From Swiss-Prot:
Keywords: Ubl conjugation pathway
Keyword Chloroplast: no
Domain UBX: 277-357
Biological processes, Gene Ontology terms: proteasome-mediated ubiquitin-dependent protein catabolic process
Matches recorded under CDD domains: UAS, UBX
Organism: Arabidopsis thaliana (Mouse-ear cress)
PROSITE patterns registered for this protein in UniProt: UBX
InterPro entries xrefs: Thioredoxin-like_sf, UAS, Ubiquitin-like_domsf, UBX_dom, UBX_domain-protein
Domain of life: Eukaryota
Name of this protein: Putative plant UBX domain-containing protein 15
GO molecular function terms noted in the UniProt entry: ubiquitin binding
CC annotations in GO: nucleus
Length: 359
């Protein structure tokens, strides 16, 4: 300790927190820049984490509980379940950074000390990210690792999609480089940008097709020997060079190619199973153009874009073309907007019937 003031803070910490050691007090105070209130809150946060994890351990495993060295970054850390972390980060428009710690792997225990405490990393994360930590031997830790199967990853809280992963030891400089594009745009801004890019790409493809047709002259068509052309291939002469075996696509094939180029829907989250709380889960019935019907449960808090992902995943390859979703309303209909920044509940389509129609 460097000063009488710091000794006073340690004494105050020990008076408030019963049965704690001087070493624990110093570690908590140092990690919070010698702010007494933050240090006490940090200790309570660690105790809550320990209590939650103790429920999943055998008595013989109690010695495996994490030590206070090094402590997690209180200003970045979210205290709660994974679902709560997704909801909180989505409402605050922050990326959710998930760190699954292991007591058996040394690098996992150095993140708080070497990575999260790095000044540049801390500043970057505080601006755009929320950090959620869990140990892999806990019930929630096992559930998350079985679903995502990795230890350090970045989650889009709106879609639940895993969009970036890290393995092993992570250096601050490389970590910041990986996060740059997520620092530049929040989750909602990222979705809006993706929707705009899809529209721009469609416009460019249409414009390119028009330019290709403008480039042909009457002389080009006069050069064709119609008697030698089959119904599905042509030889195009341009600038003195000939390109053989140029196959023209049918209308359905063109739409299929266009669709595969344009559609980049978010990855579907896992469907809620069993008896679900109707206050948090909704059921959507989808009617496809060929008469098929599919039903699927979603969390009411999940983004409506997942409905497009679900419909697209159930289309046959021959049906893989541009489509729109229409909500069946008595006496009217409502075409859904893919760019809507809303959940199923907010958009008013929870427990409704949706029809898929071709554009």
């Amino acid at each position: 300790m460097e000063s009488n003031y710091q000794r006073t803070l340690v004494s105050a910490f020990l008076n408030i927190s019963v049965d704690q050691t001087v070493e624990t007090a110093i570690k908590c105070l140092k990690s919070t820049n010698w702010k007494l209130e933050d240090a006490i809150n940090l200790l309570f946060a660690i105790d809550r984490m320990r209590n939650n994890q103790t429920l999943t351990l055998k008595p013989s495993d109690s010695t495996r509980l994490p030590s206070l060295s090094p402590p997690p970054p209180l200003n970045l850390l979210f205290n709660g379940s994974f679902e709560d972390a997704k909801l909180a980060s989505s409402s605050k428009d922050l990326w959710l950074l998930v760190h699954i710690q292991s007591e058996t792997e040394f690098p996992c225990n150095t993140f708080n000390r070497d990575l999260w405490s790095n000044e540049d990393v801390s500043q970057a994360l505080e601006f755009r990210f929320m950090l959620w930590q869990v140990y892999d031997h806990t019930s929630e830790g096992r559930k998350i690792t079985s679903f995502y199967m990795i230890q350090h990853f970045l989650i889009d809280p709106i879609t639940g999609q895993n969009i970036c992963i890290w393995r092993g030891e992570i250096k601050a400089k490389g970590f910041l480089k990986d996060l740059k594009k997520y620092i530049d745009a929040s989750p909602h801004e990222h979705i809006a940008s993706t929707a705009r890019n899809m529209r721009v790409k469609a416009e460019k493809i249409c414009h390119s097709d028009q330019q290709d047709m403008v480039g042909f002259t009457d002389d080009d068509f006069d050069d064709f020997d119609e008697g030698n052309l089959s119904s599905d291939s042509v030889v195009v002469s341009s600038c003195g060079r000939e390109f053989d075996d140029v196959v023209t696509l049918s209308e359905d094939e063109e739409e299929t190619c266009l669709s595969s180029d344009l559609f980049e829907f978010p990855v579907l989250t896992k469907e809620p199973k069993g008896d679900c709380d109707r206050s948090v889960v909704c059921s959507i019935s989808v009617r496809f153009p060929n008469g098929r019907r599919k039903q699927r449960k979603f969390l009411k808090s999940e983004p409506v874009q997942l409905l497009w992902s679900f419909c697209y995943s159930h289309m046959d390859e021959s049906d893989n073309k541009a489509f729109k979703l229409v909500q069946a309303i008595p006496g009217a209909s409502k075409t859904l907007d893919y760019g809507a920044e809303a959940s199923f509940d907010q958009y008013g389509i929870a427990n409704s019937i949706i029809s898929v129609t071709w554009e």
